[in-house]
Amino acid sequence: TDMAFLHYRDAAFQIQRAEQVPGQSIAWDMLLSFACSSDDPISGGRHKVLGSKALNIPPQTSTIASHLPKAVGAAYSLGLARRHPPEHKALPDDAIIMCSFGDASANHSTAQGAFNTAQWTAYQSVPMPLLFVCEDNGIGISTKTPKGWIGANFADRPGLKYFPCDGLDIY
């Protein structure tokens, strides 16, 4: 039920999450999106995007790192809702926001603004239930990320906890 703001290469996450929600035709929906079909349930054919309302995945285009500030805002709203319960809410009390991004995206100005906002908020002890997931695979479109840069850059940031893991080690 947690909301997931996905990197534009995260179709596998969306496909796997669809397994948890009966009645989803995610492969078909993605094909409609990739073909810019007016029947695409998330964009109506306007653009190839990942996303699904039923899966709590807001639409995301291929604009680099544009979803990170939105994820920070959503996480801030969850923290705010815990302090001042709204009349209506869409997510459970224990929800978090997951936000994935690629290693090359980490250097983009919108990503830096999102990280800074998350750190600034944490420094003030304002609740922001947010999990950033960096896919550090060295596959940047235009800018290669030096080996070890993500770990070195995130390991000691105030207000952020960095946990390296091997995404290929699934057992």
Regions of interest found by a model, annotated:
Residues 161-165:
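Structural signal for short hydrophobic segments within the conserved structured cores
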Residues 168-170:
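Outer-membrane beta-barrel proteins
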Residues 1-130, 140-160:
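Cofactor-binding active-site loop characterized by glycine-rich and histidine/acidic residues
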Residues 135:
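Nucleic-acid-processing active sites and adjacent nucleic-acid-binding tracks
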